[in-house]
Amino acid sequence: MTHVDAISAPAALGRVSVVLPAYDVAPFIEDAVASIRGQDWPDVELIAVDDGSRDGTGDMLEALSARWTGAGRAMRVIRQANAGAGAARNAGIAAATGAWIALYDADDICHPGLVRAQVAALEADPALDLAFALYRYVDEDGIVRGAQAAPATARLGTFDLMCDNLVHAPLMRARALRAAGPLDENLRAHIDLDLFVRITERRPRSVGVVPCMLSDYRRRDGQITADWRRMRENWGRVLAKLEAGGFAPPPARRRLMRARLHLYWATLAYQAGDHAAARRLARTALRADPGAILGDGHGRVRLMACAATLLPASLHDALRRRFNARRAA
């Protein structure tokens, strides 16, 4: 019996509303919707918000909605002028009727049992308001490029999320989500992080981890997360809001946060081909907290990847291909 097989949550727990913002995802939307419809939860409401797509995504959603039939299945399509991910999610949340609300992405794939496992995690621990499962990283062709390792603790709080926001495809108690307030539509990145830390500021360490791979997180060119400068700027805006509310980690923890964030930005810069920035950011991370970087296996790998950009291009490319092949194995 797998971990997912062992998870159960009674059907009487009610409707799960899945909010799915969509913008120019025509190549992926049908598979994403099918993976949600195929969940074994008995009452799933899908609210798809087309955010002014130009590639026919909205029309595809309308056609998929006409085929979304059967007991315990409801689908609504909202179409709006392009206003950004935050506005699209807010529109979907406002329309949701379920006791549980999931925020999924329109180019990702939900594995069987995802919804049930997330609801079960929240039902098993009343102190949790949000649950997410581990996930695989896939490219535009669906080829697996890596997997998210489990964090050191099964319950995460504000500091953990500000160091490394691992949350993807979360499911939340509707009342907790609405109490935390709408997503900040002025942010251009880390929109979800801003919401998550508002949830954990209301109830500390209220984010739970389901320790099995239950979704595919698609990495594509042009995604917001590919722009390390935008990510850094908006992370700073989230931090400023937290600090205005009294968030003040002690110096040692602040150094740890600085190290992890700079290494994350270094990784984004490396993936974008900005190798000079990757090396500079990695050096800052190492200076901030050498023990945190060198004492962590993933940290060492990221650091070595940035350092390898100093090698001749042919050797660096060969090492990168070998590393990617090992991650996908």
Protein language model features and the residues they cover:
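Short aromatic/hydrophobic "clamp" motif used to bind/position activated sugar donors
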Residues: I101
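N-proximal low-complexity "stem/linker" segments adjacent to membrane-targeting elements
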Residues: M1-R37
